[in-house]
Amino acid sequence: MTWLSGLYSIFVASAAFCSLGLILVAVILLSRKFLIKVHPCKLKINNDDSLTKTVDSGKTLLSSLLDSGIAIPSPCGGKAACKQCKVRITKNADEPLETDRSTFSKQQLEQGWRLSCQTKVQHDLCLEVEERYFNASSWEGTVVSNENVATFIKELVLSVDPSRPIPFKPGGYLQITVPPYKTNTSDWKQTMDPQYYSDWETFHLFDQIIDNLSLDTDSANKAYSLASYPAELPLIKFNVRIATPPFVDQAPDPTIPWGVCSSYIFSLKPGDKVMVSGPYGESFMKEDNRPVIFLIGGAGSSFGRSHILDLLLNKHSDRELTLWYGARSLKENIYQEEYEKLEKEFPNFHYHLVLSQPLQEDLDQGWDKNDPIKTNFLFKAFELGQLSHLPNPEDYLYYVCGPALHNSSILTLLDNYGVERSSIVLDDFGS
């Protein structure tokens, strides 16, 4: 019976330890509730009393402004990565954080510039906010479709109220609001073509529970470029890549969470309601009649499609337009049929598809593995197929969007050919 008494002692000790842990958690939660006092704070904006907002202390300045109807852009979802939620605090600014120091110059910091996503509201503040952010609004959209257009990319199509059209420009983006949610990735098969199942099964991506029911609303927004152009309203489209954890032994690392916003979007089904806000953006078309070259990879397809369709189908532009699109294989290519149709219809539009890792089935269909302009990294194919033949590369406009490595490779290449940064429009917040 000695072993039984020993087992009993272990059980009692374990139970006591667990109970102590639960008690400590309860004490911490109660302490936060009763000891951390929430008090009203006034945000005086642009020295205009009519714009003064009263908010609760303790939240980020970004969240407080959003709750007050002032839609400061935060494409990265409040992670201090995009550096776009800049606000100047003209009175009562706290000491800058490291994220502020890495964003602003010493003079700007002294002037009160801060990242609103990192600044906590603890007392009254006086702010300067750009007037354009007062024009941003929110819309409720209904999911029309949410199908995979590549293994890890969905095309989310929403319908908004036609009596309230969203006044966006091609190259712009909207922020998608993510409510608390819980999903099982196996349910995503409902909006996924079976051709994509095998890759998901190889990496054990199905039957994964993603629980964000206790979501922190301060970080529950993310911006996505619009794949649609204004003439397609009341429909709006996005291309969204799922942010999986890193893979360990061909399975997602269980210690690292899935992307909050992309997982929410992948869980959406026709009929679901989605809140979007905006519009925002700076990567618009420069109307100077220079020929335009689009260098697009992956989910950057949103950015390219919006501009190209607007130029050709809406503005009937006669500018020379060239699209270089990079994908791993034909299965990962997006909007190929649409672009091939446009190329036949518009003599000023040229479409080049480049595959970095064509599948055997692609080769069986006739894809030329040995052609370096068709099978290559996109930046190398572009250099061989067009850039090296341009007499004056600096006379062109370059619109760039894709994964981080794609973007950096393109920027380095263009710099080597003497292209000024002012001739490059880069959309990289989603990288």
Swiss-Prot record:
Membrane-spanning segments: 10-30
Entry EC number(s): 7.2.1.1
Domain 2Fe-2S ferredoxin-type: 41-133
GO cellular component: plasma membrane
Domain FAD-binding FR-type residues, every copy: 136-286
Location of region: Catalytic: 289-413
Primary location recorded for the protein, binned into one broad class: membrane
Pfam families listed in its UniProt record: Fer2, NAD_binding_1
Key words of the record: 2Fe-2S, Cell inner membrane, Cell membrane, FAD, Flavoprotein, Ion transport, Iron, Iron-sulfur, Membrane, Metal-binding, NAD, Sodium, Sodium transport, Translocase, Transmembrane, Transmembrane helix, Transport, Ubiquinone
Membrane topology annotation: Single-pass membrane protein
Gene Ontology molecular-function annotations: 2 iron, 2 sulfur cluster binding; electron transfer activity; metal ion binding; oxidoreductase activity, acting on NAD(P)H, quinone or similar compound as acceptor
Reported cofactor(s): [2Fe-2S] cluster; FAD
Binding site for [2Fe-2S] cluster: C76, C82, C85, C117
Subcellular compartments: Cell inner membrane
Record function comment: NQR complex catalyzes the reduction of ubiquinone-1 to ubiquinol by two successive reactions, coupled with the transport of Na(+) ions from the cytoplasm to the periplasm. The first step is catalyzed by NqrF, which accepts electrons from NADH and reduces ubiquinone-1 to ubisemiquinone by a one-electron transfer pathway.
Assembly description: Composed of six subunits; NqrA, NqrB, NqrC, NqrD, NqrE and NqrF.
Family: Belongs to the NqrF family.
HAMAP family hit by this protein: NqrF
UniProt protein name: Na(+)-translocating NADH-quinone reductase subunit F
Species this protein is from: Chlamydia trachomatis serovar D (strain ATCC VR-885 / DSM 19411 / UW-3/Cx)
